[in-house]
Amino acid sequence: MITIALPKGALLEDSISIFKKAGLNFSDALLENNRSLTIESECKRAKALLVRNGDVPVYVSYGQADLGIVGYDVLQESELKVAKLLDLEFGGCHMSLAVKNTSNYSKPTDLPANCKVASKFTKTARAYFDDLNIPVEIVHLTGSVELGPITGMAEAIVDLVATGKTLKENGLSKIDDLFYSTARLIANPLSIRLDSNPLRDVILSIESFKGT
């Protein structure tokens, strides 16, 4: 049986739709009264694990799942070994650098040296500023990073931005985009090397249906 790690939250519905087109129906996961964290497909050929987006690479890397769907932003933060197979072209949002509207910063190089930048994505933020040769202190937050500039703790934030509504409502605006993040299909490297026909068939089906 194929095991698939599916991300709970914003990516779940489209993830289930992708696998349904490939012949694996996990629609029970979308039922309002569902509390189960494991869902067997109607055809009994696969089961899904419903996990947090950030945990998908963990389950896939350690072999508890053969396949998974996860945001590119998570893959950029993770150092776990997974096979990156396909850009599924949904769940799009930008990883962005943002500052207060009242600041005088219009580009990254305007930020003062050694200023504080708040982010959930510390590895991504550090790599970005290192590439620009801009010395900053990265402050790791797990909640609403917008509060960093609002409270004066940080001059800027690095965070995911979909519509920009949250930034606008909190008096912030983007001054740069680091990258565009979409959902990605990943696999356990050993599962791929074993070259299971059912697994390969699912991957090929998804490749043919993605973006439709």
Curated annotation (Swiss-Prot):
Entry keyword Transferase: yes
Compartments, record wording: Cytoplasm
GO biological process: L-histidine biosynthetic process
Enzymatic reactions: 1-(5-phospho-beta-D-ribosyl)-ATP + diphosphate = 5-phospho-alpha-D-ribose 1-diphosphate + ATP
EC identifiers of the protein: 2.4.2.17
Taxonomic superkingdom: Bacteria
A Gene Ontology term for the protein's cellular component: cytoplasm
A Pfam family reported for this protein in Swiss-Prot or TrEMBL: HisG
InterPro entries for this protein: ATP_PRibTrfase_cat, ATP_PRibTrfase_CS, ATP_PRibTrfase_HisG, ATP_PRibTrfase_HisG_short
Protein keywords: Amino-acid biosynthesis, ATP-binding, Cytoplasm, Glycosyltransferase, Histidine biosynthesis, Nucleotide-binding, Transferase
Chief location bin: cytoplasm
GO molecular function, one term: ATP binding
Pathway: Amino-acid biosynthesis; L-histidine biosynthesis; L-histidine from 5-phospho-alpha-D-ribose 1-diphosphate: step 1/9
Function: Catalyzes the condensation of ATP and 5-phosphoribose 1-diphosphate to form N'-(5'-phosphoribosyl)-ATP (PR-ATP). Has a crucial role in the pathway because the rate of histidine biosynthesis seems to be controlled primarily by regulation of HisG enzymatic activity.
Record remark: domains: Lacks the C-terminal regulatory region which is replaced by HisZ.
Complexes and interactors: Heteromultimer composed of HisG and HisZ subunits.
NCBIfam families per the UniProt record, alphabetical: hisG
Family statement: Belongs to the ATP phosphoribosyltransferase family. Short subfamily.
The protein's name: ATP phosphoribosyltransferase
Organism name: Prochlorococcus marinus (strain MIT 9515)
Lineage summary: Bacteria, Bacillati, Cyanobacteriota, Cyanophyceae, Synechococcales
